[in-house]
Amino acid sequence: MNGWPNRPVIYEINTAIWLGDLSRAAGRRVTLADVADSDWDAVTPPGVDAVWLMGVWERSPAGLALANANAGLQASFRDTLPDLRPEDVIGSPYCVRRYVADATFGGPEALAVARATLAARGIRLLLDYVPNHVAPDHPWVTSRPELFVQGDEHDLQAEPAGWLATGGHVLAHGRDPYFPAWPDVVQLDAFSPALRAATAETLADIASQCDGIRCDMAMLMINDVFAKTWGGRTGPAPDAEFWPAVLAGLRAEHADTVLIAEAYWDMEWELQQQGFNFCYDKRLYDRILEEDVSAVRGHLHADLSYQSRLLRFLENHDEPRVASRLPGDAERAAAVTIATLPGATLWHEGQFEGRRVHPPVFLSRRPDEPLDPELAAWYHQLLAVVAGQRVRTGEWRLLEASGWPDNQSCRNLIAWCWAGDDDRHVVVVNLSGQPAQGQIRLPWDNLPGRGWTLRDLLQQTTFDRDGGELADPGLFIDLAPWQCHLLALR
């Protein structure tokens, strides 16, 4: 389908768990080819532009065996599912044996049906790619050992947890610069021209099956990061960076494919320059969860060209459920924040319903939990309002709240506005557990000389203000803890 909007809203689904839930409810196996219309409706509410089917690729039997033998992982599985059964453990979706839709989910044909079903609804499909490593039983391990970081018997003896002997070669297990090796994957060589060519081919094949690709731990392939991780084992870094070299051909063949980088360590800007449309905004996530209003505000002072290519989120398959981290009103304030900022927005299946258990990605089943229909209705209202009222249209500006000598609670307010040809919106959030008051000067020159009606799109309240006062001293704000205004000016 492609034709992505500038500020897409993406809904992540753990494919294995979702289809497992649907299968149990239906009393039969449900694949991606026969998901009921009502179930697609539930994950594509108004305001969603794309669905990320996380974990559709063929999982590794070798990786599954390692997971079943790992006492620490098994303990984490039982913490999530006290009634754990052997069939609940299916292996990691990021231990990929082949980039072919798993037969458990219906295979490639079922994936194609799902994509067509979504496209008929105007919804794009996002899929995963893992550039750094593959499963130990991936065909490349035996057929193309030159694509991997290689060692020798001395390495294997000195650090057996970091290396794998296979087919007469010693290959490195996957890792990043800061943690021990991952025992269930084999490390690809980002400096290898052959690997870069093979990656380009794989990405092109994935792009033919979807509208966007989310690249796992994309910063690990940056030349400086890879050199730091492997300390010269792979020779000097090439002149060209990995991603520009790999993506040049993809862009020629699939120009509209949106590329999203999972990115940490302040590598977002660099990955944007190397060809990614959007990068994870982990800094904003951390600052919101830490309830650091000043840091959130400082983050939003970054250049708009940078912010417009960030992916904002409050949870995903790697992070704890936001309902387990923030109380209800605080979660809603945070949700309004990320839903109305520039850039892309990511929501996670189960987030709207208030799920609190964060299941490991190795599992195909999650525990039953009490769901929160009121919270789900509120989230659906938020998405529908932001999309239907064209809130994120036109020019975005960060606004400043001022206070008084004896009242500086304005420091807990964050605010911004959007102005399009026919739309003006102001967002004010009290991102704290205390009441906050302040005045916010609105930036539009034609405010004075007439009255304006301000309508809160979430609260369904209206009030009238003089345009001169809105310009100076500004819109007076008085918000209870964790409350917000999402205002339309008419």
Report each predicted region and the residues it spans.
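Active-site and adjacent substrate-binding regions of carbohydrate-active enzymes
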Residues: 1-490
